[in-house]
Design a protein with these regions (language model features):
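Core segments of cupin and vicinal oxygen chelate
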Residues: 12-15, 21-59, 103, 113, ...
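Conserved active-site tyrosine of GNAT-family acetyltransferases
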Residues: 30-35, 93, 119, 162-166, ...
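Residue-level detector of secondary-structure transition/capping positions
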Residues: 38, 94-97, 170, 231
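Conserved short beta-strand elements that form part of the metal-binding/catalytic scaffold
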Residues: 40-74, 120-128, 176-211, 217-220, ...
């Protein structure tokens, strides 16, 4: 299938992945997990929501936990260059027959919300309330010391169409998994805006669903430390996969599940992709190193389970990729 070309002059300027809004069924339990075990910092909270961020982040929040009756991913947030980009985004959406709304969101500037053609619920904002970063507040460090939100990974029922849509928005392909043969289909794609391996990864599967969101950590030892913390604080069963190293992205990783089953990746050691002539790296779906350069094979849950988007029907994928699943 066609590999999208880099678009260097997109209709509006998305800078990076910014924040995720999660619907959770037990706000206290979710807060305790993300604050005390993982180590994110609570910036604000009330009876209906908790706002957290990593120690490197100047923005008010990078994850919002919202009290709800059903667990789901409510929104994926991206930061744009300035308020003018929001108006350009609105014009682009209108020209392409997509509805949008400007919504008031706590601690954020103007926020544009829309649902893309594939059911992913997105919001764009240029500004948030500012907070001092906490990098040098070692007395506040807990868990694995998360630094910053790095990326989102989603299950998409129509991978090629989703990849093509986000390529039009300036997301540049860094790596991809493809079937062998002259008519091989793309089954997964890693796309970036900020100059590392990805801000947004698109994976073949029942969708739209969130596979995971990820925080960047300073070292692999922080990931190993989190394993110790989770094992000694009642969360051993929440460690789903890893630690290990991906072939795709070269990242050292750990996947854990929160009390509602939302999947969080702790992530470090990928690489720079910001050069304009950076060539995407192709992986054959028959090459097991793409998922696991070393470490235990991924369990079935990692391939099959994800968080639905609030109010969106989940559809079967257009094709079923041949992947290796651990027994």
């Amino acid at each position: 299938m066609p590999v999208p070309q880099h678009v260097f002059d997109p209709p509006f300027n998305i800078i990076r992945s910014s924040h995720v809004v999660l619907d959770v069924t037990n706000l206290d339990a979710s807060r305790a997990f993300y604050e005390n075990t993982v180590g994110l910092h609570v910036e604000d909270h009330d009876d209906s929501a908790v706002y957290l961020r990593g120690s490197e982040e100047h923005q008010h929040h990078s994850v919002v936990l919202r009290k709800a009756t059903q667990a789901a991913c409510n929104r994926l947030g991206f930061k744009v260059g300035n308020d003018g980009d929001l108006d350009k985004a609105a014009a682009f959406l209108s020209e392409n027959g997509l509805t949008y709304a400007f919504a008031e969101q706590p601690f954020q500037g103007r926020t544009l919300q829309f649902t893309d053609p594939f059911g992913f619920q997105i919001e764009l904002t240029a500004t948030m309330d500012k907070r001092p970063h906490l990098l040098r507040r070692y007395d506040l460090y807990k868990g694995c010391h998360p630094q910053r939100l790095d990326h989102f990974n989603v299950f998409a029922a129509e991978v090629q169409g989703t990849v093509d849509f986000y390529a039009r928005l300036g997301f540049r392909l860094t790596e991809y998994g493809e079937e062998d043969g002259p008519n091989g289909r793309i089954a997964a794609a890693w796309m970036h805006r900020k100059g590392n391996v990805h801000d947004f990864a698109i994976t073949n599967g029942r969708g739209p669903r969130l596979h995971h969101f990820a925080y960047w950590l300073p070292t692999a030892m922080n990931i190993l430390h989190l394993c110790d913390v989770m094992a000694s604080s009642g969360y051993l069963a929440n460690i789903e996969r890893g630690p290990g190293r991906h072939g795709i992205s070269n990242a050292f990783f750990l996947y854990v599940r929160d009390p509602d089953g939302h999947r969080l990746e702790l992530y470090t050691s990928d690489y720079f992709t910001g050069d304009h002539d950076h060539e995407p790296l192709r992986w054959s779906l028959r090459d097991p190193r793409r998922q696991t350069l070393w470490g235990a094979p991924a369990p079935r849950s990692w391939f099959e389970q994800g968080s639905p988007f609030t109010g969106q029907a989940v559809r079967e994928p257009q094709f079923v990729a041949d992947v290796t699943i651990a027994d």
